[in-house]
Amino acid sequence: MADPTGARATRHAAVVACLQRDGLSALLVSHLPNIRWLTGFTGSAGVLLVGPAGMTLITDFRYASQAPQEVGPAADVVIERTNVPERLRRAIEAMAPETLGIEAHVLTVREAERLSAGLRSRVVPTSDLVERLRQVKDESEVTAIRSAAALAQEALAAVLPTVAAGDREIDVAARLESALRLRGSEWHPFPTIVASGPRAAMPHARTSSRELRRGELLLIDFGAQVDGYCADITRTVALGPADDRQRTVYQIVREAQRSSREGIRAGMTGREADAIARDQITARGYGEAFGHSLGHGLGLEVHEGPRLAATAEAVLPVGAVVTVEPGIYLPGWGGVRLEDDVWLAADGPALLSDGRTDLIELDL
């Protein structure tokens, strides 16, 4: 990613400004995506102590070579071979913050109690301090998400022509996940959803061994990851020629999704964004069949802020990347969902995925 050192310095300064605003002397960061955002460290274990003068990453022997390479000058790196909690305690005592913020949504009560026992610092719970900063993406982050979306779409385009009679949902998922990896996806941000026929009425169906059947719909929800950043895309296709009901439901979802991705703006609330699609689907008689929110933030995590939901009153910030994914789910029949990734730029929404939602009818 471009100029990681400069970006990390800017992010550190933003966290310090939040600490000063909230009356905190330092922050203990335990959530790994937050640590990666601040330092570039991609390991599976570590804690980060953030203060006005700098940051200290404490991790274990497994990352003795990796951590310094990834972090560079963004933070001091401490490799602790035996007792990371004790080494963290010594680092806090050396910094001597009067008040130490902790990520209350990450640390367990037991971990927080152990940490605070014997510390002179007053331990203060915080909520989503770093996550709120992460909602606003810089150019390099947007580029990574766009790249992830592009390779995801290339993978799907390669796999759809291979879908054949006798395939199981899990066969399609396996070929898609292989195609994603072969095109450069670092990992699958979530288990690929391939749901056919009546199973597509389950928004988060677990991919099964059910065989695909001509005349049904096939819902595919999948993602890719580039430089740690996620794309999240859903397409629904017909297995053979679509019938009138399938076309009607599909078109309702397609129109609602297009209106939403074109009408969403930074500065509106998550509730207002959700209402664009929800009102259209409700007006067509399917409001009760659209039971989930319109979308969510996207970045280092596949589900992050901001929320696009009927109960979300927070304002969508300039620079956020969100999914737009309305759906209609009819038990016993199936479901349709269409999902694209949208960047809320200052001058309006910009698609990061291709937005191609013409109904595809596979020759099964």
Protein language model features and the residues they cover:
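Active-site neighborhoods and metal-handling regions in enzymes and metal-associated proteins
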Residues: M1-L364
